[in-house]
Amino acid sequence: MELAALCRWGLLLALLPPGAASTQVCTGTDMKLRLPASPETHLDMLRHLYQGCQVVQGNLELTYLPTNASLSFLQDIQEVQGYVLIAHNQVRQVPLQRLRIVRGTQLFEDNYALAVLDNGDPLNNTTPVTGASPGGLRELQLRSLTEILKGGVLIQRNPQLCYQDTILWKDIFHKNNQLALTLIDTNRSRACHPCSPMCKGSRCWGESSEDCQSLTRTVCAGGCARCKGPLPTDCCHEQCAAGCTGPKHSDCLACLHFNHSGICELHCPALVTYNTDTFESMPNPEGRYTFGASCVTACPYNYLSTDVGSCTLVCPLHNQEVTAEDGTQRCEKCSKPCARVCYGLGMEHLREVRAVTSANIQEFAGCKKIFGSLAFLPESFDGDPASNTAPLQPEQLQVFETLEEITGYLYISAWPDSLPDLSVFQNLQVIRGRILHNGAYSLTLQGLGISWLGLRSLRELGSGLALIHHNTHLCFVHTVPWDQLFRNPHQALLHTANRPEDECVGEGLACHQLCARGHCWGPGPTQCVNCSQFLRGQECVEECRVLQGLPREYVNARHCLPCHPECQPQNGSVTCFGPEADQCVACAHYKDPPFCVARCPSGVKPDLSYMPIWKFPDEEGACQPCPINCTHSCVDLDDKGCPAEQRASPLTSIISAVVGILLVVVLGVVFGILIKRRQQKIRKYTMRRLLQETELVEPLTPSGAMPNQAQMRILKETELRKVKVLGSGAFGTVYKGIWIPDGENVKIPVAIKVLRENTSPKANKEILDEAYVMAGVGSPYVSRLLGICLTSTVQLVTQLMPYGCLLDHVRENRGRLGSQDLLNWCMQIAKGMSYLEDVRLVHRDLAARNVLVKSPNHVKITDFGLARLLDIDETEYHADGGKVPIKWMALESILRRRFTHQSDVWSYGVTVWELMTFGAKPYDGIPAREIPDLLEKGERLPQPPICTIDVYMIMVKCWMIDSECRPRFRELVSEFSRMARDPQRFVVIQNEDLGPASPLDSTFYRSLLEDDDMGDLVDAEEYLVPQQGFFCPDPAPGAGGMVHHRHRSSSTRSGGGDLTLGLEPSEEEAPRSPLAPSEGAGSDVFDGDLGMGAAKGLQSLPTHDPSPLQRYSEDPTVPLPSETDGYVAPLTCSPQPEYVNQPDVRPQPPSPREGPLPAARPAGATLERPKTLSPGKNGVVKDVFAFGGAVENPEYLTPQGGAAPQPHPPPAFSPAFDNLYYWDQDPPERGAPPSTFKGTPTAENPEYLGLDVPV
């Protein structure tokens, strides 16, 4: 199958101006140099195509013609749309004297509009018989050819051809022809006569004086494209081609673009015009459709009209083919996604497929219309071992039994021997032939072993010829009325070498006697084209079963159609008048006027009605309405099938009365209680207002901050059991342990932070500060405190995180992490930091090592050793000293010790970089002293290989020098939530689709599960439930009992924020910071993360609670299961030792402006963090808490120095937790004399330095 066949045009008729003669438009061919499909009928094929034709819509190919071929049918051709090919002919003349223009819309070998090749015997051939003239083309005789719009000329190997070298081809080529090539061979075997003396310049197409070349370009005056003479007044109109007879665009011999009723135009008139007066688009009565180079009032038959005014063979994208009632076909835009259609060979995904095979036959299952063609070649039934294609089995051909229409052609050159006909296409009605085989045939059957055709439903061959030849067993070819199938006079049947008709008749292979006019597709009454009597289904019959036989029938247009099954057969008369139940003469069972029915309706609901209908049959079989029309609970029926009368019993009345009285009493009691409670509330509020007015002794100075209603759970040491050490530092040790609450038969795995003996009061104070911070947060993505044990050494109890820290997790599972994992973690960290921003908490130490992994899909921010709460009037925090992570800090934090939420954004960008590099060290190999200069010069961390520019640009925005230019955390939440829904678009990991799923464990995780006593444990979040009386203004007596027994009840929360849930501030409730804003415009963290996290604690609320809170989702793209938990207590992650000592840097003394601690607040006042605050310059409040050395986490330790002797030797494990990530801004003094050095000291490790610039 040739792809060029898609461009073949069917035989069509286009009209010239009124009163002018009709222009016959015919199809071209697309065989190129291939041998004819049927050499015996090749000349007949050309004659049928071009007889009387004037415009060839395609290519004019004249090949393999014998010497005696009569080609007079070509003499009317004036225009060719494609190319002209004259090749491999023995004929001496080709009468194309009237051909004026070759447009070259298709080109031979993509370059040539005129190709004349191998016409005649080769030059080295033997001499022909004496007296016989050698065959071959002798003269072109294209005396009228004056225009080739596109393409060149190729004339090669024509030994008898003369005069081709005398033609001035430049004059014929259009001035804009970019392919004006001429390859002309002048070798010939005979002597040529000179041109006639009448020919100027000896330029001619033959030796006659009529064959002189007409020049219409090179002789023109300047500026003319074509002319009729050398004078300036002889110029043709710019829309003319091939010359003219006058200066107007109606005097053209051919049109350059479009012929509109004999006038050459640049465009055809539009179908719609715009009315500037009414501002409306109006139909244009002069509008025309574009068809080839002509403007037509309607698209020719078999073509599709479009809304843009063109005639096409295939509808454009998002359009569908529609057939109007008058039979015209057009393309209509789909109002919704176009319905799926069946494509055939040469279309869409089957464009390069040659034949129907077992590999693609299922593409046609259930298809009624195929847009394309069907071809069956020997390879279809032989199979192809090279492509592992099995042979096509005969039973597989049954998929075509539903086929009714083919828009292309049907070509069959191979068929199973077991099938005597083509009856698998018995329902095929139309072969449109918009695409033709070799540009000529819509139906081709050759070399088959079938005995008859069997195409009993075929009614139309829309275009092209039918070729049936070399089918040695085929009969019934002449019994088909082919003329009734064709749609234009240039179509015909070409048949040769089939079984002789007399042999067929001799063997009884003739049409059935019931076939009208002896027309049939095969033997038997089912193969008739039309029936002489009646048609029942697909079979011709002598009479219908109107008066006898079952089932009874009625006659409609000589078709026998069955009566309805409920019609009673009549003797000697008709039974029905139509197919419906209301068209019966008598009913077989019952009649529910006007329909015959099998039974009367009993409780049947008619269409569009909710009221059932009950009927019963009377003595005559007619359905009558029942006296009672029951609507529900119709159980009891009488002997007629009608509902029995329902009588209410006395017991029912008594029960109804009692229930009514009780309902009234209950409602009265309820209303009385409500009224009494309302009066009590009014009395209580009045008394409280009066007492406040008389007892206030000093004015109120409210801060506007929300009260911190978090609760601290106090645990006893007997409830805790330490299992093994997870890590140690200079100030304490982290244990894996089990919490066994008193009176509860549960074991909860926990992490226990224990301060060392003889630690300084400052260390105790700072671990309590960390406990204060951890207890006050409540987000699914931030670790919270489970409790605190106030023994001689303070112990913090948090939930055990079995997967360890995120930094180790990504390093261990580098090859098993996907883009969705990384983007989900980035989104969850951003949500956690957004929550901390909303509660005015500056973390100051955000890094991958300080993010714990609860599950591969859930991470939490931890390690609040450096975190600081901002007061209600604070916007930033200035640190006094201590150890800080230099390579994660923003530039203003390094230079001015200024920490804000936007400096946390900088750290967030570095954390994302760590994830995207699978745990690489930022600025690895660069000393810490060089980091400030490096950042000020504009250098930043490089783009990770797996990151797209979208993700990297978010990191770059986080590292802007101006903190106000960095994105807010809520913006980062939005960005990474969007990316997490389409992860592979933003993070590119090689072979991600082929890799394993996300890791489910880690080395740290496996080490935590090694102990035998860790079995049968209960997760802390499953154990903790809301406590009683959390927000109750008037707690019940005894509410201060056991801490872990106060979780049995809750109160409700109304909209607007006036009342809050009576829940313990556990993982399910997010208590507000004492400095959190009290305005109504809350954070989306509270609306989303808090609300979702609270759902688990709300399980004990009353069922009428209207709270809109819902659970949060760990994965933004996957709905959260009901059993999924989202909260994890923190577990400190200890990375490899990366600390360095800075012994020469001394701490800064406290500011003398800082005053003593404020007096304790009275009982019942709002809980606030104890703080030592004093106003500084510009009203900035500074916190005198030190940076480092406040917690037992070894990542925050100030390393031991060697400047002075130690009273006690350091522990053996202490150096193992020196962390190079942290920079000691204010190390403790070692007993050496105070240093007066003002600047950057020299240290043992030049990568990490301390700064002593005062704040």
Curated annotation (Swiss-Prot):
Annotated Gene Ontology cellular component terms? apical plasma membrane; basal plasma membrane; basolateral plasma membrane; cytosol; early endosome; endosome membrane; ERBB3:ERBB2 complex; membrane
| Compositionally biased tracts (Pro residues) | 1146-1155
Question: Which positions are glycosylated?
Answer: 68, 124, 187, 259, 530, 571, 629
Post-translational modification, briefly? Autophosphorylated. Autophosphorylation occurs in trans, i.e. one subunit of the dimeric receptor phosphorylates tyrosine residues on the other subunit. Ligand-binding increases phosphorylation on tyrosine residues. Signaling via SEMA4C promotes phosphorylation at Tyr-1248. Dephosphorylated by PTPN12.
* Signal sequence, start to end: 1-22
| Residue spans, topological domain Cytoplasmic | 676-1255
In the record, the effect of residue 706 to A is given as: No effect on isoform production
Q: Spell out the InterPro entries in the cross-references.
A: Furin-like_Cys-rich_dom, Furin_repeat, GF_recep_IV, Growth_fac_rcpt_cys_sf, Kinase-like_dom_sf, Prot_kinase_dom, Protein_kinase_ATP_BS, Rcpt_L-dom
Topology feature Extracellular, residues = 23-652
Q: Which residues carry this modification: Phosphoserine?
A: 1054, 1078, 1083, 1107, 1151
Q: Mutating residue 687 to A: effect? A: Prevents synthesis of isoform 3
Positions carrying Phosphothreonine are: 182, 1166
Q: How does it assemble?
A: Homodimer. Heterodimer with EGFR, ERBB3 and ERBB4. Part of a complex with EGFR and either PIK3C2A or PIK3C2B. May interact with PIK3C2B when phosphorylated on Tyr-1196. Interacts with PLXNB1. Interacts (when phosphorylated on Tyr-1248) with MEMO1. Interacts with MUC1; the interaction is enhanced by heregulin (HRG). Interacts (when phosphorylated on Tyr-1139) with GRB7 (via SH2 domain). Interacts (when phosphorylated on Tyr-1248) with ERBIN. Interacts with KPNB1, RANBP2, EEA1, CRM1 and CLTC. Interacts with PTK6. Interacts with RPA194 and ACTB. Interacts with PRKCABP, SRC and MYOC.
Name of the featured protein = Receptor tyrosine-protein kinase erbB-2
Question: Which organism is the protein's source?
Answer: Homo sapiens (Human)
